[in-house]
Design a protein with these regions (language model features):
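Expand to "…catalyze enediolate/carbanion chemistry for C-C bond making/breaking, isomerization
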Residues: 1-152
Length: 152
């Protein structure tokens, strides 16, 4: 059985989306990591506006706290228009968190902690990713993402 579950959420009902990611978060808690380690929820029909997506992420983080999953499950965010604070929309480093569709990546906190322990320079990863994007250049990175979008 695969350790990564991919869910394509169809529709634009945010209440159903919340129910879906909560169900998947609970499945992570209830399933051993050797069977299910992480879940990607792909959102081709909803939250295409980045600000609305960020609002949904904020609400989802609040819900994690309310259902006592804060510190157990993390939500990593990926969006076609992802933009870090203090960057311009065209800055290539934004592409480290860009994806063909909005996505919610549900991670086990314990797995993230194991990765941190196993990789002593964990804090270097974001800078290394930005360096990679800068080496590739904006034109090449945009072309790679466009190629993915054309195949979908």
């Amino acid at each position: 059985m695969p350790q990564i579950r991919y869910i394509v959420f169809e529709g634009n009902d945010l209440e159903k989306l919340t129910e879906t990611w909560l169900k998947e978060a609970n499945a992570l808690v209830e399933t051993t990591p050797s069977v299910l380690e992480t879940t990607l929820i792909i959102l081709p029909e909803v939250l295409d506006e980045f600000e609305a997506y960020l609002d949904f992420i904020d609400m989802s983080e609040f819900i994690l706290e309310e259902v006592d999953l804060d510190g157990v499950i993390q939500i990593a965010s990926f969006h076609p228009d992802y933009q870090f604070d203090e960057t311009e929309p065209t800055d290539v480093e934004n592409y480290t968190n860009r994806s063909p569709f909005p996505m919610l990546h549900l991670l086990r906190e314990e797995s993230v902690n194991r990765a941190i322990e196993a990789y002593p320079e964990i804090g270097d990863i974001p800078d290394n990713n930005i360096d990679t994007m800068n080496k590739l250049g904006l034109t090449r990175v945009k072309q790679m993402l466009d190629d993915i979008n054309r195949t979908n």
